[in-house]
């Protein structure tokens, strides 16, 4: 049994999260790459849309057409799952993946850390969906 849920995500909210994360990071270590700022928002919005679509494919969700600032999707969840928590996880995964991509050439360690965090969050989301294909596993065989 699954429960279809519609999740709506604000592009501007994700941009604000990215700006906040880079501001904190820059404050802690100003010698690192510069912060991502408001003039970069059109580029960030494009990346957010493509990352959102990829995330939908990875979780078995069905993305709807973009409506100005809102990205929405329908995802089938196991019963009793809090939709707000899944929405927050989607936003977190998108933010982390964008940070990983943005810092890939400037700070590889930070980029790898963001990818690890995103993968952990994705695994959690996938555990609550009923439409996502199982994560591939290698099974040892002894002959």
Named regions from a protein language model:
Residues 77-89:
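Short, mixed-charge amphipathic alpha-helical segments
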Residues 87-97, 101:
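Elongated alpha-helical scaffolds
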Residues 52-55, 102, 122:
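Hydrophobic residues within well-ordered, non-membrane alpha-helices that form the packing/core
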Residues 1-79, 127-143:
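Conserved short "hinge" loops at termini or chain/domain junctions
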Residues 40-43, 86, 90:
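Conserved acidic
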Residues 101, 106-108:
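Mixed-charge, glycine-accented linear interaction segment located at domain edges/termini
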Residues 113-126:
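Short secondary-structure subsegments characteristic of cysteine-rich extracellular domains
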């Amino acid at each position: 049994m699954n429960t279809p849920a519609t999740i709506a995500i604000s592009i501007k909210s994700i941009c604000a999260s990215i700006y906040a994360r880079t501001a904190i990071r820059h404050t802690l270590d100003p010698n690192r790459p510069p912060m991502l700022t408001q003039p970069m928002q059109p580029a960030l919005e494009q990346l957010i849309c493509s990352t959102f679509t990829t995330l939908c494919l990875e979780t078995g969700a069905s993305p709807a057409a973009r409506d100005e600032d809102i990205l929405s999707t329908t995802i089938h969840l196991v019963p009793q799952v809090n939709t707000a928590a899944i929405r927050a996880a989607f936003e977190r995964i998108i933010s982390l993946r964008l940070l990983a991509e943005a810092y890939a050439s400037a700070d590889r360690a930070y980029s790898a850390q963001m990818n690890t965090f995103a993968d952990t969050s994705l695994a959690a989301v996938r555990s609550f969906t009923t439409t996502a294909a199982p994560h591939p596993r290698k099974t040892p065989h002894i002959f």
